[in-house]
Design a protein with these regions (language model features):
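Conserved AMP-binding/adenylate-forming
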Residues: 213-304
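Residue-level signal for inorganic ion chemistry
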Residues: 31, 98, 130, 179, ...
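AMP-binding/adenylate-forming catalytic core of the ANL superfamily
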Residues: 179, 282-389, 405
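Beta-strand->loop->alpha-helix junctions that form or flank phosphate-binding loops
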Residues: 229-234, 353, 394-395
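Active-site phosphate/ATP/adenylate-binding loop shared across adenylate-forming ligases
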Residues: 1-6, 58-224, 237, 247-248, ...
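Nucleotide 5′-phosphate-binding alpha/beta core
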Residues: 1-97, 101-121, 125-126, 358-363, ...
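A polyampholytic, Gly/Pro-enriched intrinsically disordered region
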Residues: 176-185, 228, 249-257, 411-415
């Protein structure tokens, strides 16, 4: 039995980049021709010229908030705001809703969300039974996991959420080998089983998502005899990255291209620096190009010890949307980026807001190697020009600012 889901996982860098150079122009062209919204966004782009990650990074970023606005504007004529390249009917068996609401299409394709790869890495194998405890109501999480389980040859018990006693009875009767759902609900099941004296020790492995699973909780699961793995997936994009037995970050899925950009911009940051996760899908059905997730992450250096050769990320590290109201004016990360672009000598910057309610103090902290004379004054003028607010400028040596992805830090007292 193969240790890998397919041969794509162990490609050389050269093989992967060659495949990407062929896939990107085709995907851009498909998006332009079959997705009305992406066609408008990419109308001035020559698809044939987008053959690498470098060229991809020059395309505009579409953020989730924009997707929601376009969907609202297009309803009821177009539920998906012009982003889907598939229409209602046999090819779209379901439509799901996520908070917003944002509507997402289901597609009649094997393992549409590509979760099978994460299932395989978590040790799920053909012939096993998966206890699927994601909600089957309105949102796609349960169907994402179920389609992935089917892709690796598993059967699924559609448990959903709640009704803990009935779920424990079903586990005791059916003896599933695996669990999929949130980590918090798995803990509830295990604790309730202990209290009730119900044997559910058949569950030896789990694939969890939807919320954080810190090391302390993973250790607790291990002590209960359950080997838990995490995956990072969204309703819009499907599987983005997944955990392996190496337990070193998350390996990026083969069906997406991942970039880490400075929040509020489309500019890639150096490997290891925290920024916003931007994803391009290679799906012909829902072709999202440079989709800003609003989540923070960072590239993890090196390759996975398991032999999976794709890029790795550190996982979910918070939210990138740091828009803050200062003295009645909204200031967003893109404005800070605009200020930084005016000064080549500035390496990184962070806007820190302090003070108490109605007495906001704004300080722009910038890193510069050898700040020239007059830099503070010129940056101060740029701050006033861009934000229409006055603030203090503080110049720091390179490496002084924390590597946590924050561009705007709200340190005000709200007592």
């Amino acid at each position: 039995m193969s240790a890998y889901f397919d041969a794509l996982e162990t490609r050389s860098d050269a093989q992967r980049e060659l495949a990407l150079s062929q896939a990107l122009p085709a995907q851009i062209r498909l998006a332009q021709q079959h997705s009305a919204a992406m066609g408008r966004i990419l109308k001035d782009i020559d698809a044939n010229g987008v053959t690498s990650r470098t060229e991809l990074a020059r395309l505009p970023v579409t953020r989730k908030s924009e997707l929601l606005d376009l969907q609202k504007a297009g309803r009821p004529a177009d539920s998906f705001g012009g982003f889907a390249a598939v229409v209602r009917g046999p090819k779209m068996p379901r439509i799901f809703a996520s908070p917003g609401p944002i509507y997402e299409p289901d597609v009649a394709a094997r393992d549409y969300w590509r979760v099978g790869r994460a299932m395989h890495a978590a040790g799920f194998r053909a012939g096993e039974l998966v206890h699927n405890a994601f909600s089957y109501h309105m949102t796609p999480g349960a169907f994402m996991m179920e389609s992935g389980a089917h892709a690796v040859g598993c059967s699924v018990f559609p448990a959903g959420t709640g009704q803990t006693e009935q779920q424990l009875a079903a586990i005791a009767d059916l003896q599933p080998q695996a669990y999929s759902g949130t980590p918090s609900f798995l803990r509830i099941l295990l604790e309730k089983a202990q209290e009730a004296g119900v044997a559910i020790s058949s569950i030896k492995k789990g694939l969890v998502s939807g919320e954080a699973c810190p090391p302390s909780l993973r250790e607790w699961f291990t002590a209960q005899g359950v080997d838990v793995y995490q995956c990072y997936a969204t309703a819009d994009l499907g599987l983005i990255a997944y955990e392996t037995s190496a337990r070193e970050g998350l390996v990026v899925d083969e069906g997406v291209v991942v970039e880490i950009v400075r929040p509020g911009t489309g500019d890639p940051v150096p490997d290891g620096e925290v920024g916003e996760l931007v994803v391009t899908t290679l799906s012909p059905h829902y072709p999202l190009i440079r989709f800003g997730t609003g989540d923070l992450s960072a590239v993890l250096a090196g390759t996975c010890p398991t032999g999976r050769s794709n890029q790795r990320i550190k996982g979910w590290m918070g939210r990138a949307d740091q828009t803050t109201k200062i003295k009645g004016m909204f200031v967003h990360p893109g404005q800070v980026a605009d200020i930084v672009r005016r000064f080549p000598e500035v390496l990184r910057a962070r806007l820190v807001v302090t003070g108490e309610m109605a007495n906001d103090q704004m300080t722009l902290k910038v890193e510069a190697q050898q700040p020239p004379e007059g830099l503070i004054e010129r940056i101060g003028e740029a701050v006033r020009d861009v934000t229409k607010l006055r603030g203090t400028i503080e110049v720091l040596t390179p490496g002084s600012l924390p590597n946590d992805g924050k561009v705007i830090e709200d340190a005000r007292s709200y007592k």
